[in-house]
């Protein structure tokens, strides 16, 4: 059975993660309910004529994918992408034109570019990758679904080099609807303590994170992907069994985990689940990232980026620590990531530092 190694990674987020300055320049913007991605200089990676025709998510995805592949020095045989909402800006643009023109004289460009698989398709065209190209739209575990697909193909020996990523973007009208529905946290409730949130709602984020995966260990390898597990619905009381069973399948115990990366955010409704998860690791360092990057359907991809970067960092960054007093008891080897949203779409990702 083949192994799966992460040999390249790139993250565009609300933090300067793309610059590679992890985590020196990270800072919390605690007073904003909507966090925008810090976009890279696209013209350094995409021809200017093409940039004008691309939506934000396509541009972010193209650049993040290019950098991850460049780091890994590989050409992918397949491309798998997870997204919760796809190219929202083009979707809204097409619908607005549809209404403004009374369904007459419409150009198909915005519609074609609004489909969820646009990012994966554009990356494939740019790379001339004619292999498997899949986009997963599974809510808060969209990225994990793509990651699970990668793992299965690697284990079966069908593919050796795969590009996988998660991407989501803001759009004005959808953000407005989120605010009306109370999904986005009221600015009057900010700043909100992440460990003891006192109100419902999220701080909405966006971003693109890509990983170049291979079945071969190399000098560029940052971690090994051991396993991925997805469970649609759990109660807080079932979190312990979910985690313990997952680790047992991989021949591990709770005490074997050296570092935990939690998808804890500032939504009061999510607190019981993450409290139950944290209680399983009373002395293990736990990192959090959504207070910096925001909550969105594929935010967990940013969590994998944080995990890979942090476990290769000389000291765990204080700005990411849920419990600053905790220190690794021994060199970091096994890293466990947990994410969920509103009690649904729970996921676990297990990494091993190389």
Language-model segments: what does each one mean?
Residues 1-132, 144-148, 152-156, 167-354:
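Conserved "HGTGT" condensation-loop signature of ketosynthase/thiolase-family condensing enzymes
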Residues 161-167:
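Short, well-structured beta-strand segments enriched in hydrophobic/aromatic residues
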Residues 133-137:
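Short catalytic-loop micro-motif centered on adjacent basic/acidic residues
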Residues 140-142:
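Catalytic nucleophile serine of serine hydrolases
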């Amino acid at each position: 059975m083949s192994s799966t190694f992460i040999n390249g990674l790139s993250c565009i987020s609300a933090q300067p993660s793309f610059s590679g300055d992890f985590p020196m320049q990270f800072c919390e913007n605690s007073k904003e309910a909507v966090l925008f991605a810090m976009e890279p200089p696209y013209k350094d990676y995409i021809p200017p004529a093409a940039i004008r025709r691309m939506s934000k998510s396509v541009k972010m995805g193209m650049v993040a994918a290019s950098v991850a592949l460049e780091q890994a020095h590989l050409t992918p045989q397949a491309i798998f992408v997870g997204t919760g909402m796809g190219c929202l800006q083009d979707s809204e643009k097409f619908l607005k034109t549809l209404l403004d023109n009374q369904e007459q004289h419409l150009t198909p460009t915005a519609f074609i570019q609004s489909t969820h698989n646009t990012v994966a398709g554009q990356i494939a065209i740019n790379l001339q990758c004619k292999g498997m190209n899949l986009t997963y739209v599974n809510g808060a575990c969209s990225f994990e679904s793509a990651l699970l697909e990668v793992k299965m193909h690697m284990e079966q020996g069908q593919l050796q080099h795969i590009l996988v990523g998660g991407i989501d973007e803001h759009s004005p009208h959808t953000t407005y609807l989120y605010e009306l529905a109370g999904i986005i946290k009221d600015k009057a409730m900010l700043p909100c303590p992440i460990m003891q949130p006192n109100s419902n709602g999220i701080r909405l984020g966006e971003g693109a994170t890509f990983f170049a995966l291979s079945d071969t260990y190399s000098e560029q390898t940052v971690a090994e992907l051991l396993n991925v597990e997805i469970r649609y619905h759990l109660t807080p009381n079932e979190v312990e069994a979910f985690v313990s069973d997952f680790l047992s399948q991989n021949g591990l115990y709770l005490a074997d985990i050296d570092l935990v990366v939690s998808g804890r955010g500032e939504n009061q409704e999510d607190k019981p689940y993450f409290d139950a998860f944290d209680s399983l690791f009373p002395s293990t360092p736990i990192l959090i990232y959504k207070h910096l990057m925001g909550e969105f359907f594929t935010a967990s991809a940013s969590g994998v980026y944080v995990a890979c970067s942090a476990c290769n960092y000389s000291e765990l960054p204080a700005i990411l620590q849920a419990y600053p007093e905790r220190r690794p008891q021994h060199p970091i080897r096994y890293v466990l990531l947990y994410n969920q949203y509103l009690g649904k779409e729970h996921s676990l990702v297990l990494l091993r530092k190389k």
